[in-house]
Amino acid sequence: MYFPIVALIGRYQDTGLDAPLTALAQMLTQAGRRVLVEAETARNAGVSGYPVADWDEIGRTATLAVVMGGDGTVLGAARHLAPYGVPLIGINHGRLGFITDIPLQDAHDALGRVLEGNYQAEDRMLLQGGVWRGEQQMYSASAVNDVVLNRAGRGGMIEVRVELDGAFMYTQRADGLIIATPTGSTAYSLSANGPILHPGMNAMVLVPVAPQTLSNRPIVIPDSGVLNMTLTAMGRVEIGASVHFDMQTWSDLQPGDRITVQRAPHTIRFVHPEGYSFFSTLRRKLHWNLMPQATDNLE
């Protein structure tokens, strides 16, 4: 039997998930699977009648996690479950949905095919980041999409000295600096004019946000390297800066703080129905197939 124990995870603040999650749980039970419901999902979405489990129990027990929500919901679940090796499948109940690639209306059919063994699996890298103040590590977190250094809301540009494996790259003055995985290359990085990286690539991309010097362009680096970024005390950095991990966890920064980013030791496995294509997702989400049309009311 494929995936005998399935965990259900939903977007916490979405009160409209009760019916679709309950229907999904019933479908899984009828298919002979044991269903677990993540604790916060059960509490906030109102799903009842099934065993409730915390993240640790899901990680130790589940053979598949079904995540219903937007990409942000999947990112949070992935960070929790990656160390356990539990594969994820995403059902889109959000907006764009690059990694929640199954539309809600197709969820039962798609999941049924997956349970029959008709699926594709892919492993994607994560980033591991740390904040150092002198020799003391102040903060550590992982990220599926990106690690982002940002100026404070009313502050000036930040200045960051960037090194890769001890070799000096540049000193960057900008509103921010994005370090993205291939998965994250279609998120914040893309909106800052970063390149799209195929998820099978072993790489990271550095993308400046509104750099002072226009010649400071995105650069792709191997994922085997260790990035060291030091926030300098020049300019108006003292007003405030922070580092964000998938825009869900963060740490405030001070001048002189050092941020390290490298590939995490574990990966996250995504499960897709048979026939999934990364390029098909790009065509749908980015409307690559839409051609400009002539109109009669051109201005």
Curated annotation (Swiss-Prot):
PANTHER family noted in UniProt: NAD KINASE
Name by which UniProt lists this protein: NAD kinase
Protein purpose: Involved in the regulation of the intracellular balance of NAD and NADP, and is a key enzyme in the biosynthesis of NADP. Catalyzes specifically the phosphorylation on 2'-hydroxyl of the adenosine moiety of NAD to yield NADP.
MF annotations from Gene Ontology: ATP binding; metal ion binding; NAD binding; NAD+ kinase activity
Binding positions for NAD(+) per the UniProt entry: D71, G72, N145, D146, R173, D175, T186, A187, Y188, S189, L190, S191, A210, Q248
InterPro entries from the UniProt entry: ATP-NAD_kinase_N, ATP-NAD_kinase_PpnK-typ_C, NAD/diacylglycerol_kinase_sf, NADK
GO terms under biological process: NAD metabolic process; NADP biosynthetic process
Active site (record annotation): D71 (proton acceptor)
Phylogenetic placement of the source organism: Bacteria, Pseudomonadati, Pseudomonadota, Betaproteobacteria, Burkholderiales
Localization: Cytoplasm
Cofactor: a divalent metal cation
